[in-house]
Amino acid sequence: MMPEICPRCGLPKELCVCEEIAKEEQKIKIYVTKRRFGKLMTIIEGFDTSVIDLKELAKKLKDICACGGTVKDNTIELQGDHRKKVAEELVKMGFSRDSIEIR
C-alpha cells in the first residue's frame, strides 16, 4: 500500500512540513467584541484555510477554554474573553508568537 502524498509539496504525509511552515507564516489577530446583551466574544482571524482545518482548531480551542463557539467566514468565534489563553495555546500548537497580535 502506498503512503499518502501531500498535494502541495509532493512528499509523503509523514514527511510533509507544509502545515508547520504555514503556521509560522500566518498573521493571526485575536480580539474581543461585544455582542447581544453585552456578552463578550473572542474573535480569532487570519488563518490560511487551505492548510489548517478551522473546524478542528475551533473544537480544540473550545475544549481548552471550556466555552461555546463557532466558525464563521474564516474566523473562529469563542464565547467570553479568552485572548491570553488562546494565544498561549496557539503557540503550543506551533504557531509563531511573533505572528499573533492581541488587541
UniProtKB/Swiss-Prot annotation:
Domain of life: Archaea
Alphabetical UniProt keywords: Protein biosynthesis, Translation regulation
Family listed: Belongs to the SUI1 family.
UniProt xrefs under Pfam families: SUI1
Protein name per the record: Protein translation factor SUI1 homolog
Organism: Methanocaldococcus jannaschii (strain ATCC 43067 / DSM 2661 / JAL-1 / JCM 10045 / NBRC 100440) (Methanococcus jannaschii)
Transmembrane segments: none
GO terms for MF: translation initiation factor activity
GO BP term, example: formation of translation preinitiation complex
InterPro entries xref list: DENR/SUI1_TIF, SUI1, SUI1_arc, SUI1_arc_bac, SUI1_dom_sf
